[in-house]
């Protein structure tokens, strides 16, 4: 630690638990192991670039490509055109577009429908629910164009009813906390 930071109190996950945010591949595999709903996916490395291209060619668009690591909010691209998806794979895996963050790329099923974020504070066993938000990631009007690093958000989210929050608790939050405990991953 830097000496000036010694007196600053903060909260956050330990390194292993932080992978849930820092590695899309880790998070997807964790969700799969613990029955947490998530889009179908496959992960590829630079050495598997040709296999990744073959996988994209076997799928219907839109094509969702995600740099495995943190890329400043710009590591996810959704492309309608297969040619553009193949070029983006070359850029991400072949040319390391996002450095080590794109040393692996997750190719994911495209899901449609409303999207919102749920935030919790947890000690790894209990949690406190914070307000939900809907963010606006795309640079253009009507959520078009490339993702930005974060342009804005709206909270509260009208579509998030008590029933929806109950479903999120049962299907996402509780299995995540139980999965962390089952895998002996301390959260804080």
Where are the model-predicted features located?
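A short, GP-enriched loop/loop-strand-helix hinge that lies immediately N-terminal to
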Residues: 1-23, 36-46
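A short alpha-helix-loop-beta-strand transition element characteristic
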Residues: 10-14, 35-42, 61-63, 97-104, ...
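Short gly/pro/ser/thr-enriched loop/turn and capping motifs at secondary-structure boundaries
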Residues: 16-21, 71-72, 137-139
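Short acidic active-site motifs
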Residues: 50-52
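CheY-like receiver
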Residues: 54-55, 88
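Conserved anion/nucleotide-ligand pocket segment
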Residues: 60-82
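Internal nucleotide-binding/catalytic subdomain
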Residues: 75-188
């Amino acid at each position: 630690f830097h000496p000036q930071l010694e007196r600053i109190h903060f909260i956050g996950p330990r390194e292993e638990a932080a992978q849930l945010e820092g590695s899309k591949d880790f998070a997807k595999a964790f969700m799969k192991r613990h029955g947490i709903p998530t889009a179908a996916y496959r992960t590829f490395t630079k050495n598997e670039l040709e296999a990744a291209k073959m996988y994209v060619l076997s799928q219907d668009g839109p094509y969702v490509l995600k740099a495995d690591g943190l890329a400043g909010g710009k590591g996810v691209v959704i492309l309608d055109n297969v040619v553009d998806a193949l070029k983006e794979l070359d850029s991400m895996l072949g040319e390391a577009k996002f450095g080590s963050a794109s040393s692996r790329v997750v190719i994911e099923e495209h899901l449609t429908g409303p999207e919102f974020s749920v935030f919790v504070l947890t000690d790894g066993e209990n949690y406190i629910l914070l307000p939900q938000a809907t963010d606006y990631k795309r640079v253009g009007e009507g959520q078009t164009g490339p993702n930005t690093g974060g342009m804005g958000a709206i909270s509260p989210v009208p579509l998030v009813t008590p029933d929806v929050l109950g479903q999120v608790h049962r299907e996402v939050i509780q299995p995540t906390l139980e999965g962390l405990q089952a895998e002996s991953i301390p959260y804080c």
